[in-house]
Amino acid sequence: MNKAVFGSFTILCLLSISSIPVLIHVVRADGGTVFIRADGSIDPQTAPIYTADNITYTLTGNITADDDGIVIERDNTVLNGAGYTVMGNGSGNGIDLINRNNVTIKNTNIENFDYGAYLENSSNKTTSGNNVANNSGGIRLDYSVNNSVSGNNITANYRHGIRLDYSINNSVGGNNLTANGGDGVYLYYSVNNSVSRNNVVNNGGGIGLDYSVNNSVSGNNLTANYGDGITLGSSSNNSVSGNNITANNAYGVHIDSSSNSSVSGNNIKANNWNGIRLDSSSNSSVSGNNITANNVYGVGLYSSSNSSISGNNIANNGYGVGLDFGSNDNNISANNITANNGHGVGLFSSSSNSIFHNNLVNNNVQVYSTSDSANIWDCDYPSGGNYWSDYNGMDLKTGPYQNKTGSDGIGDTPYIIDSSNKDNFPLMGTFSDFNAPSKYHVQTICNSTISDFQFNGTAISLNAAGKNGTTGFCRISLPAAPINGTFTVSVNGTDVPYTLLPESNNTQSYLYFTYHHSTQEATIPEFPSSIILPLFLTATLLTAMIYKKRPTRTT
């Protein structure tokens, strides 16, 4: 009889012990809200949070709350969720910080609140390594300064993934933002913030800025968002650089009613509307972007002015560059506008735009211009106009009137677009612009493909690839400041004659020379029909820096 009683008692004890973890993993007290008080205490004391030093607070179980989850009233603290979950019922904030400084929130799962984490008037706070999902909004900062939001997974929130309102000098970086109903990241009336290296996929929109100034959006991946990849609305002096912006359902980058925006070095591909769109915007720069396979325009301007579109690769889009509804006084230069399905450049009721040094190659229609559009298509002589792949003119003459014997890389007759538009000095080869030391530029017009440009301060070298057995030419424009003196042009180690155009002056030198593409010089096996010719352009420099002496002055 006693043995039977002992056995029953043992079983009951084991069952009781096994139930203890279940009791401490889910805690409700005072509506479920847990407070870290200003004096370092935890309220209620039964909450599954442990601290040994009143600095680092570590969850030891899950928390379920009817309103706010955890309210931190103490500065200089660390909340380590240790992988546990703070679960709400659709109201309140998962983690709530108001008027706090130097707080870290990490490794916490936060679900089913109004906001997963909410900061107001807070500074020097780090939010990292958290999973914030299925809330109305993910993480929100109001009137907050010098905070970092990094390395979080923010998914399936009804509104924005991360939102900053009236906030300054914050960093939002390295987060994974997916399937949020609003923008992955949204800034409103915010200044000097950095949004970088985030993966922003399948959200209502990618990254949005409204009424915001001096922010940087860089190095993000923005893919398959239902709206725009990046939107700047009524904002100024913002930078968008080095982002991968692909397959978004609207525009890749949309700049609306904004000024002094910079969009540079981005890969903008296969977006449903324009790659880049400027609406009612001014004084913006779009440069060095790779803009391909977008369904409508690569770059489209609508009622926008005084902006620069330069150095972009704009290829295989529905259309290349479009200016519409009074987009005047813009500069479109040094772009490769290639193989677009419609027109390469379209102008609709837009005038006084400068369009030169572009390579327009194999577009279905090179230019479409309405009768009320009159624009400038060249930069005078000898700088020249654009390269047109369908230009059939010759280059037997030189000079500003193309009436002197000799070649100069400029076509002898204009390229006619319509009665109001013509390129007076069409280029005979593609245009390239290379950076040289001290912010100088070296520009080439060449019927070969240029690569491996190098300038060491005393010599310029470049490779030119062309069809086997043909004659190549190159016209090089050099700044006189770093290179002045007597020139020597060498092709494959052999000096060749060149022409120094009479228009050369004390600021710019123009050299023209020819060469033959020869199979004996083939050095790249994957291009058997092409050759690579090293072209060395050397100048004897008469400067103290190089030779430690100056030429004798004549009196």
Language model features: what each stretch is:
Residues 19-56, 84-85, 124-125, 129, ...:
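Functionally critical loop-and-helix segments that line ligand-binding/catalytic clefts
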